[in-house]
């Protein structure tokens, strides 16, 4: 079951997001996830993307299962980014897809009544089109600020978040892209926030999460 409260602070990560760490990035991801869950993140989205990500499907599945176990232990929703079939196989709580991934209608057909669906939107037009899709639980809006994880994407700014919010789209919104402890407060009135580097690169991860939750 989807509860919009889970969007308050979503941690998004995969092994590639620890590129700055020497050593075993998989263990560092799992350690960081457990610390983040103890620090009260409200959901975790498993995202393996890019050249530094795991490429072997068996390894990806194994790591996803480890992350899922931790989420179950702490009672936080476990969401898989893009990998719809993996999300179904593992019985994840949700799946998050982008505009360039599998067609949203196909995702709905596969996932309806089995797991909740989040959809990325980068324009007001995409958000208006998605508002009639009952099976889509929430919309991810971004990148709000410049971010290394989405170098190829045009920054949409807080303005787009405000436009979607004011347009009458009733679906819960979650902002993503370049969000830090210093700019998160600008976004709270529109919905939740999703972060990668604000946690993965924080020197004091627990403090970063506590600060983000208060924003």
Residue ranges and their predicted role:
Residues 141, 174-179, 195-199:
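Glycine-rich beta-strand-to-loop/alpha-helix junction loops that act as flexible
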Residues 157-158:
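Short alpha-helical segments enriched in small residues
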Residues 94-103:
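Gly/Pro- and small hydrophobic-enriched strand-loop and loop-to-helix capping segments
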Residues 1-94, 110-136, 163, 170-171, ...:
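Conserved N-terminal beta1-alpha1 strand-loop-helix module at the mouth
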Residues 146-147, 201:
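Short gly/pro/ser/thr-enriched loop/turn and capping motifs at secondary-structure boundaries
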Residues 97-98, 137-144:
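Non-cysteine beta-strand/loop elements that form the S-adenosyl-L-methionine
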Residues 149-153:
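Glycine/threonine-rich flexible loop motifs
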Residues 49, 100, 144, 198:
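Flexible loop residues that form catalytic
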């Amino acid at each position: 079951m989807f509860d919009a409260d889970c969007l308050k602070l979503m941690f998004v990560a995969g092994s590639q997001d620890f590129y700055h760490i020497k050593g075993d990035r998989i263990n560092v991801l799992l350690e960081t996830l457990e610390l983040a869950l103890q620090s009260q993140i409200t959901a975790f989205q498993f995202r393996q993307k890019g050249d530094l990500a795991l490429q072997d499907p068996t390894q990806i599945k194994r790591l996803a299962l480890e992350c899922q176990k931790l989420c179950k232990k702490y009672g936080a929703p476990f969401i898989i980014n893009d990998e719809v079939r993996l999300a179904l196989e593992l019985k994840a709580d949700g799946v998050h897809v982008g505009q360039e991934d599998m067609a949203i209608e196909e995702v709905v057909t596969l996932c309806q009544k089995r797991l909740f669906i989040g959809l990325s939107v980068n324009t007001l037009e995409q958000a208006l089109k998605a508002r009639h899709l009952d099976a889509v639980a929430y919309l991810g809006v971004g990148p709000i600020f410049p971010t290394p994880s989405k170098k190829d994407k045009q920054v949409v700014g807080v303005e787009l978040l405000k436009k979607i919010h004011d347009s009458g789209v009733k679906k819960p919104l979650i902002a993503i892209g370049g969000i830090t402890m210093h700019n998160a407060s600008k976004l709270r009135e529109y919905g939740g926030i999703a972060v990668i580097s604000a946690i993965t690169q924080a020197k004091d991860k627990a403090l970063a999460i506590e600060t983000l939750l208060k924003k």
